[in-house]
Amino acid sequence: MNETGETPPQQLARNFNELLQELRVALSGVQILFAFLLAVAFTERYEEASAYIRGIHLVTVILVAISFGFLMAPAVWHRMLFRRGHRENILPIANRFALCGIAFLAASMTGTVLLIAEVAVGGVAAKILAACAAIMF
């Protein structure tokens, strides 16, 4: 028993469930951002976009996809290894994957701010806004 009155397996189950709950929140944001970025490619204005804007967009889409993969992996592992007694091995790795997913999410949010700022104001102001977003994340 620990200070919360849980046995080690109970604490492990709670920690894993808390991680999965946190990932559900992050994944909702990733899915919305991914949908927005996918929709952008099918607008009339996208056809007129410069190679620079298209490059920012493509890199940002890739960053969001990587983020999604990292954030989704712990839930998939949990489902695949459910009731096989591997939680103590999976939890540290799942935590690292979650942190990587959040880092890629921060990079993709910065890319999204840069993309929108380049279209809206362009130039140095766009880079400053993206840098502010990067610092914030």
Feature names for model-found ranges:
Residues E48-F137:
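Alpha-helical transmembrane segments of integral membrane proteins
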Residues M1-A49, S67-A75:
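Cytosol/matrix-facing amphipathic helices and coiled-coil assembly/linker segments
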